[in-house]
């Protein structure tokens, strides 16, 4: 049985307007802020945990993926960093900060790779 598009749109609007959705977005923001706080103190693994949690709570939160990418990069988890940057850009393609972070990440990794090949 096919549902009319209007019904599907109405259902989606109801879900996104529900308190649980709003609560998840709010909790995701809290997790990102907490992650920033602990990262500033050098607790990168805790920051990664918090930002992963934020992306689970709100999979559309581009800033959480950007922060997660930075933490992965700091911890030397470069494949994970690349994937997180790409996800952040996919979610927010016009975010110049994310794009700059990703371009710098690629530039540094390209230089490192070339240096290792010599």
Residue positions per predicted region:
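Conserved structural position within tetratricopeptide repeats
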Residues: 53-56, 89-90
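Helix-start (N-cap) detector for alpha-helical repeat units in TPR-like alpha-solenoids
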Residues: 28-29, 62-63, 96-97
